[in-house]
Amino acid sequence: GLKTREVAQLLGIDQALISKFESGTRKPTREQVIKLASLLEIDLETIMVAWLKEKILYEIGHDEFALKALLVAEQEIRYLSKPANKKLSTTLQKILDEIDVLKTKLDSFRKFDSFRIAQALELEYTFESNRIEGNTMTLRETDLVINEGLTISGKSMREHLEVINHHEAIAYIKDLMQKNMPINERELLTVHNLILRGIHPEDAGHYRKVQVMIQGSSHKPPQPFLVTKEMEDYFIWYETNKLSLHPIVLAAEMHERLVTIHPFIDGNGRTSRLVMNLILLQHGYIIANIKGDYDSRMHYYRTLETAQTKNNKEDFLLFIAQIEKESLERYLVIP
């Protein structure tokens, strides 16, 4: 092996410093660690992890709040290391191009009266979004509750409220869209309040104060004391990326990021889908309606799980883009 003097010469530093590195009285800089790894043929990741660990212990090792601070830092590092996928895959880019061709057709089509069509699509959206969450109302029953004010025998009060609330939440996001209001914390909490109104009055429009688990998923949402900070980061991320990303990618990212934080006791899925659709509507697209049948639901959950646990959003972005493309195609062929 190399002698201390030789290592010092090769690194271009004083020999006494090497001795201090060895004894632990001095810490090498990042650049010195990288040079050492190369010189001593040590795996860079191994030595960097060891160096960072020592750095953390030196700074906070003896502090009584160290563990809690580390938990907060871990969540934040995870969040910040999930960059928006700015370099899009060829497959995704191809679908986005096809969507934009359809959107151009839609823009000329909109000159005709499309109120009746929009109404039909919104009804289907309420039906499907609630069906994903286990609501057993049929499309016809959903229509009767919304448009005729009927009560369906054999269906629970909660199921009726889910239909009415979702319908009102759509009206609210359309109002935001018409006023050109950006999504922010106040508007998000209002949307959530509408979704859970009369169902969980004490939780409607409030972040959760307890830990939650997502049934059937290995993703563990952040601890309740981290939720407020994660949501601050969520809106900062939106403001930072809203002008640089394709609107479909932006909408899908905001959907995935919100459902991953899971900031509410209940209603996370419906609220995340409404946020996504608000962004789509604001950019002149139409509601992306994820179906609630078993196969569609499982596909949706699978792509979300991959984004959450493997930090790979490609499948989820493709899934949302495909849904929007199908929604546009359907809208354009309705007579």
Predicted regions and their residues:
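FIC/Doc superfamily catalytic core
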Residues: 54-63, 74-335
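Short alpha-helical DNA-recognition segment
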Residues: 2-20
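Generic structural marker for isolated residues within well-ordered, non-membrane alpha-helices
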Residues: 4, 33, 276
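Short, conserved catalytic or interaction motifs in soluble domains
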Residues: 23
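DNA major-groove recognition helix of helix-turn-helix/homeodomain DNA-binding modules
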Residues: 29-46
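Short amphipathic recognition helices of helix-turn-helix/homeodomain-type DNA-binding modules
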Residues: 43-67
